[in-house]
Structure formats: structure tokens, C-alpha cells
């Protein structure tokens, strides 16, 4: 574990900016802001999804910011989503960084006259790059660790 009793202001600013980038991704997802979400990525980004977790074949392997539109638009199939980012790590190397973040993503949809909740436990593995003083995702790998699906009670509508 790094010793953060005293870190340079620029390192602190970079770490905060990267955390804000990770959180902005979740906020944009829940707000159905696909354009805002895409803007968090470099033009030549690489985005890979592994629905069966680590060690599985990729279910989506996308290159370029514009290729992300269908993935982000897919969230519109749900009534509401809520992404909770948890623990994360970041390793800085100048204007590049790597990191990982754990997330519980909640998805509510209409199903058979009722509502269904699908919770996905996700681990993101990221490569970040800073250009023009702004951090963006150069690569994002999304690993689904497990999924739980259950029927919701009638109370507590979005």
C-alpha cells in the first residue's frame, strides 16, 4: 500500500479527477446520458465486456468512442438503474494511469405485469490517459462477477 501521509498536490488532483471520471460514468449511465458517457472516453478507446467474468471470452469488444453508443443506449431497456461504485485502486504514471473499481449495478425492468430487479456485481479494469488536462478512459474492461435477479414488491416505484 502506498504511503499517502504527504502527497504532492498534482498527484492528489489527478487521483481526485480519476475518481470523478469513474463516478461520472455511473452518473451518466443512470441518467441515460449516452453522449455524456461517451465523452468520458478517448476517440480511440477500447471497451471490452466479459459477461461471464474473468477467464471468459469477451461478449463485446469495441473500438472507438462512437462504437459505444449501442452499449450505453441498451440501458434504456430498463425503467431505472442505479450504479454504486465501491472500492477502487489507481496507479499513476505521468499522464497515464491504471486502476480498477468494483460496482454493484441495479437494473429494474417491467416483467410479467410486475417489476424485476437484476443486480450485477462488476469489476472494471481501466487504463486512463490525461490529455489537455482532462482524464479519460483509454480502455475499460467490464467483468461481470455474478448476477442476481428477483421479483420486486409493489411498493417503492422509481
Region locations from a protein language model:
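Charge-dense, low-complexity intrinsically disordered segments
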Residues: 8, 12, 58-62, 115
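A near-ubiquitous, low-amplitude feature marking generic local secondary-structure context
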Residues: 1-8, 20, 51-55, 73, ...
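A solvent-exposed, acidic/Ser-Thr-rich amphipathic alpha-helical stretch
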Residues: 34-104
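Alpha-helical elements of Rossmann-like donor-binding domains used by nucleotide-donor carbohydrate transfer enzymes
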Residues: 24, 67-70, 123
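Enrichment for repetitive, rod-forming helical segments
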Residues: 26, 72, 147-148
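A beta-strand edge to alpha-helix "cap/lid" segment located at domain peripheries
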Residues: 2-7, 76-158
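Aromatic-acidic/polar surface patches that form glycan- and anion
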Residues: 14, 18, 30, 61, ...
